[in-house]
Amino acid sequence: MKTLKNTCNEKGEEIYMTRKEFQEFIAKGKMILDGATGSNLQKRGMPTGVCPEEWILEHPDVLVGLQREYIEAGSDVLYAPTFSGNRIKLEEYGLADQIGEMNRKLAGLSFEAIRQADTDRQVLVAGDITMTGQQLYPVGNLPFEELVDIYKEQIGYLVEAGVDFIVVETMMSLHECRAAVL
């Protein structure tokens, strides 16, 4: 786990926290998460019906600015804008072959927001994942094992990018949630 700690030292080198320091950080009693990223991006120009991940990569300053505002408002955790960055959702936009590059770059934007923020506080980045929009077999055609692999793939890219932890959110199916955490 590469957990960024107060971003850089006086030499400009990135500083990382240990597992014990991470556990102490989350045990402090409360963590303030960032806000409603999708709706705030729409207020700042992201049209409906586009691939949010692609739009953010085309307009990185919008996301970085929004996340800097969250930090300055007191957020301890930024969600990387990887909400629907799984292979199935990206395939809807013809972007499945870019899953690794997109997830790494999107997480990197959150780290950039931390670097640019005017704070001495430690801020963490969570890799954010959600449902695929596909129904699992026998209701749908998606085998459970394939769904596990889809989530493992996205999580793997987020871990490569250095996120501090993974958030699984907005799941409508207990089985899909289970696949994401396996």
Regions found by a protein language model. Name each.
Residues 4-182:
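Domain-level signal for soluble alpha/beta catalytic cores
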